[in-house]
Structures are given as structure tokens and as C-alpha cells.
Regions:
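Short glycine/serine-rich loop segments
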Residues: 110-152
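Basic nucleic-acid-binding alpha-helical/helix-turn surface characteristic of O6-alkylguanine DNA
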Residues: 1-109, 156-184
Length: 184
């Protein structure tokens, strides 16, 4: 299979976008471990239609104008990984889930650690929103782009990462909830 790529700037650093003829195959970080996402030889082609669509959608997302991506995706992984990545796509903008919740969603309630491993191998960062998955108790845990980037993405989506898995409303609603808790 032929893969093409381009590199774009973003508020969370430079991102490498990789596409096949089927769709977007990867969004990786500038300092990403090359063993994390393996696709084969890449050819630079910033004019490829999938890459242009992904770039436009990412710019709109970072500009606060896009909440749901529509660029076609081409996941490469095991069946289990693909089931986890498909579950990521169901997490709405501004909400979070735990690894355990994803495990239950895919019908493997005892597979939280395996879900975490698959989440860590997610080839299409941001668009398949692995940043919306938090550790037990709502902790920010490992993220290929770094915890600062994960925090930035959650904040962009109106989530206060310090609230963990609770308060899944807007930042205003979260602040009101925090105020009510402090008053009682």
C-alpha cells in the first residue's frame, strides 16, 4: 500500500499526517516513537486530497469551529485495537471516558489494561480522540503527545482536566459545580 504524508503546525506542536487512498492512516507527533505507528514507506505529498481535508479539519478544530471530524479514516491494527479505536470515535467532544468504560463498551470488561495499550497505539491522534480517555479516578495518564498536549486538547474542548471524569458539561457548568461543592 502507498502512504503519503505532510507535516503541519498546530497549537500542540508539529503533526505528521499520513494517508492512504482509503483515508487518513495516522496523525503522529513531532517527537513520536517511530515504532508506535508502523505503516511502511512514506512519500511526501502535501496536495493529497485526504491530507488536505485532514489539515482543514484540524485547523477548524484548533480554531474552535469543529467538534466532529468527517475525514475518512484507514485504521491499521489488530481486531482488538480497531474495536478500541472505534470506541474512541463515539466519545463526544467535551466528554471523557475511563479505560474501564471503554473496556465495558467493547464487551471486554476485564480488559482495561489492554484498552490502555491499544489507546497508546492509536495511530490517528486527536481525530480518534484518545486524549478523551482518562485513568482510574479521572487522572491524566500517558499520552504519545505528552500530558501537556492532552491537557491542552481537553481544555480546548471545554473540559477542565482537573475535574477528571466528573462534571461533563461546559467549563461554565463545571465551574458552577465546583462552586456548589465548595459552598456545601
Amino acid at each position: 500500500m502507498r502512504y503519503v504524508y505532510t507535516v503541519i503546525n498546530s497549537p500542540v506542536g508539529r503533526l505528521k499526517l499520513v494517508a492512504s487512498e482509503k483515508g487518513l492512516a495516522a496523525v503522529t507527533w513531532e517527537n513520536d516513537d517511530p515504532r508506535r505507528v508502523r505503516l511502511g514507506p512514506l512519500e511526501r505529498d502535501p496536495t493529497h486530497h485526504v491530507l488536505k481535508a485532514a489539515e482543514m479539519e484540524l485547523k477548524a478544530y484548533f480554531g474552535g469551529k469543529l467538534k466532529k471530524f468527517t475525514v475518512p479514516l484507514d485504521f491499521n491494527g489488530t481486531d482488538f485495537q480497531k474495536s478500541v479505536w472505534a470506541a474512541l470515535l463515539t466519545i463526544p467532544f467535551g466528554e471523557t471516558r475511563s479505560y474501564g468504560e471503554i473496556a465495558r463498551q467493547i464487551g471486554r470488561p476485564d480488559a482495561s489494561r489492554a484498552v490502555g495499550a491499544a489507546n497508546g497505539r492509536n495511530p490517528i491522534a486527536i481525530i480518534a480522540p484518545c486524549h478523551r480517555v482518562l485513568g482510574a479516578g479521572g487522572k491524566l495518564t500517558g499520552f504519545a503527545g505528552g500530558l501537556e498536549a492532552k491537557d491542552h486538547l481537553l481544555t480546548l474542548e471545554g473540559r477542565d482536566p482537573r475535574l477528571g471524569l466528573t462534571g461533563q458539561g461546559s467549563r461554565k457548568e463545571q465551574n458552577q459545580s465546583r462552586w456548589v461543592l465548595q459552598q456545601t
